[in-house]
């Protein structure tokens, strides 16, 4: 039978088929997307304009992506079975010491959110902005003797990226085992030659991808946003920086770049290594070498590495923000480059204001993603009307992800206050319970607030109607950004 592609019936059948596929996809979204906002944000366009939304849904949708989540959980189980013979997690004493500490109660439910326990006797150091961060990371790698683990969302083949590449090549030539993991989507601009040079020099480097095989190119929504460096099991780093010149303030439109990292030593480094091992095992089906020191210090601060991701049994990242806000009795200060809270987190912020808590959120004054910036602006205006003090950082782009609760609890890591970090990305955050370290974080944030402009009720009223329309459209699609 010959199909006449110029027949009006052909186009009628084609449109009917597209609308039928749109209905099927909308039903799939309703059954698989975890949140009502996200389900509606997908289902309505799929029903009414499927010819514009079917392909984006194939690429960005299918939130629960059950096949992937099942495979990821299975890989994690296999990895932990493989680790069983390593006498890993020998932190019983540090975990018991943490639980017996008076500071432990300040975390409330937070220690139960993650797979890894809160541990005592750690040392932490605040690293403010790119120079301090990469000076410390490079100095630590320079002294490496056994194993270096490096994981970033973005690696650029620029001045900083090349400096890291040369340093890792030099250490590999000295006999150090070097492992590098980067996200395939975040590092999409990284040329294959960058990785090949490292491989030729003895460095093991792999891209983190959601799935193996050709279909992976159509599934870009799950991204590994973690930033982890561990050297010899003795010194580690996590925070907001990626590897690129812009993180040193070399991007004219976004400079100076404001970001925060933290340097860590102590038993919690075992947790950072375990998080890296899970991602490395998923990418390679092999375990990297994991190192434990012979002894730990007898004193230090309470820390917990909170790793989160779409394969978790619960929405770990959003629950962390909820519990951090709910637990605040005096203040909760949050800095994030994106401010797209879901209904629960927004309600928690509103309730904290009603309890008399000093609630402040610091966001950028310059956009790096215009749609996300527009959505963030509308949420910021609504937060101001709810009594939250919202600030825009003025000197340059703000990329740090920091939470300060009352006088003891701080969190520094890779997680943003948005739907992507809540439900789509793999993230890692370091929770620290220590008044001295919290004082340092407070001083750092106080300086940031002094360089910020507070958003006022007048700002919300002076916005042009076209801008308001754009913000509302951006907010409508924010659950799928």
Curated annotation (Swiss-Prot):
Recorded name of the encoding gene: clsA
Q: What does this protein do?
A: Catalyzes the reversible phosphatidyl group transfer from one phosphatidylglycerol molecule to another to form cardiolipin (CL) (diphosphatidylglycerol) and glycerol.
Q: What is this protein called?
A: Cardiolipin synthase A
Show where the PLD phosphodiesterase domain sits.
220-247, 394-421
Q: What is its main location?
A: membrane
What high-level taxonomic lineage is stated for the organism? Answer: Bacteria, Pseudomonadati, Pseudomonadota, Gammaproteobacteria, Pseudomonadales
Checking HAMAP family in the record gives: Cardiolipin_synth_ClsA
Q: Which PANTHER family did the record assign?
A: CARDIOLIPIN SYNTHASE, PHOSPHOLIPASE D
Query: Can you list the GO cellular component terms from the UniProt entry?
Result: plasma membrane
- What organism does the UniProt record list as the source? Pseudomonas putida (strain ATCC 47054 / DSM 6125 / CFBP 8728 / NCIMB 11950 / KT2440)
Keywords in alphabetical order, please. Cell inner membrane, Cell membrane, Lipid biosynthesis, Lipid metabolism, Membrane, Phospholipid biosynthesis, Phospholipid metabolism, Repeat, Transferase, Transmembrane, Transmembrane helix
Task: Give the catalysed reaction(s), semicolon-separated.
Answer: 2 a 1,2-diacyl-sn-glycero-3-phospho-(1'-sn-glycerol) = a cardiolipin + glycerol
Enzyme class at the top of the EC tree: transferase
Protein localization: Cell inner membrane
Q: What SMART domains does the database record attribute to this sequence?
A: PLDc
The record's InterPro entries line, in alphabetical order, gives: Cardiolipin_synthase, CL_synthase_A, CLS_N, PLD-like_dom, PLipase_D/transphosphatidylase
Q: Where are the transmembrane segments?
A: 10-30, 40-60
- Which family, according to the similarity comment? Belongs to the phospholipase D family. Cardiolipin synthase subfamily. ClsA sub-subfamily.
Question: What are the BP-aspect GO terms?
Answer: cardiolipin biosynthetic process
Instruction: Decide whether keyword Signal is in the record.
Output: no
């Amino acid at each position: 039978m010959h199909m006449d592609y110029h027949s009006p019936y052909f186009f009628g059948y084609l449109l009917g088929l597209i609308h039928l596929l749109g209905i099927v996809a909308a039903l799939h979204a309703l059954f698989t997307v975890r949140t009502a906002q996200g389900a509606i944000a997908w289902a309505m366009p799929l029903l009414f304009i499927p010819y514009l939304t079917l392909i984006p849904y194939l690429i960005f949708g299918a939130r629960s992506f059950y096949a992937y989540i099942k495979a990821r959980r299975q890989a994690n189980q296999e990895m932990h079975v493989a680790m069983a013979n390593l006498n890993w997690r020998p932190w019983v004493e540090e975990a018991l010491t943490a639980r017996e500490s008076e500071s432990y109660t300040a975390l409330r439910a937070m220690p139960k959110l993650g797979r890894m326990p809160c541990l005592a006797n750690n040392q932490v150091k605040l690293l403010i902005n790119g120079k301090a961060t990469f000076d410390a990371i490079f100095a630590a790698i320079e002294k490496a003797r056994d194993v270096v683990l490096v994981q970033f969302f973005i690696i650029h083949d620029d001045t900083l990226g090349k400096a890291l590449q040369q340093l890792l090549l030099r250490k590999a030539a000295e006999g150090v085992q070097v492992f590098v993991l980067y996200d395939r989507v975040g590092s999409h601009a990284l040329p294959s030659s960058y990785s090949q040079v490292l491989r030729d020099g003895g460095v093991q480097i792999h891209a983190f991808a959601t799935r193996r095989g050709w279909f992976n190119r159509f599934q870009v929504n799950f991204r590994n946003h973690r930033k982890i460096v561990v050297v010899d099991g003795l010194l580690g780093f996590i925070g907001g920086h990626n590897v690129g010149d812009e993180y040193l303030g070399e991007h004219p439109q976004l400079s100076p770049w404001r970001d925060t990292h933290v340097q860590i030593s102590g038993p919690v480094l075992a947790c950072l290594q375990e998080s890296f091992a899970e991602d490395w095992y998923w990418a390679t089906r092999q375990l990297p070498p994991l190192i434990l020191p012979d002894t730990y210090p007898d004193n230090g601060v309470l820390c917990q590495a909170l790793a989160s991701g779409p394969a978790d049994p619960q929405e770990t990242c959003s629950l962390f923000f909820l519990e951090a806000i709910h637990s605040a009795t005096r203040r909760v200060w949050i800095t994030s480059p994106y401010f797209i809270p879901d209904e629960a987190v927004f309600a928690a912020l509103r309730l904290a204001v009603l309890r008399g808590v000093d609630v402040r959120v610091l966001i950028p004054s310059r956009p790096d993603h215009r749609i996300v910036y527009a959505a963030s602006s509308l949420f910021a205006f609504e937060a101001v009307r709810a009594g939250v003090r919202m600030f825009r950082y003025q000197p340059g782009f703000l990329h740090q992800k920091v939470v300060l609760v009352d006088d003891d609890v701080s969190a520094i890591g890779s997680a943003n206050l948005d739907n992507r970090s809540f439900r789509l990305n793999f993230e890692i955050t370091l929770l620290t319970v220590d008044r001295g370290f919290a004082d340092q974080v407070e001083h750092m944030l106080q300086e940031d607030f002094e360089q910020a402009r507070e958003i006022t009720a007048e700002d919300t009223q002076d916005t042009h109607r076209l801008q308001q329309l754009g913000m509302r459209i951006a907010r409508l699609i924010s659950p799928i950004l």
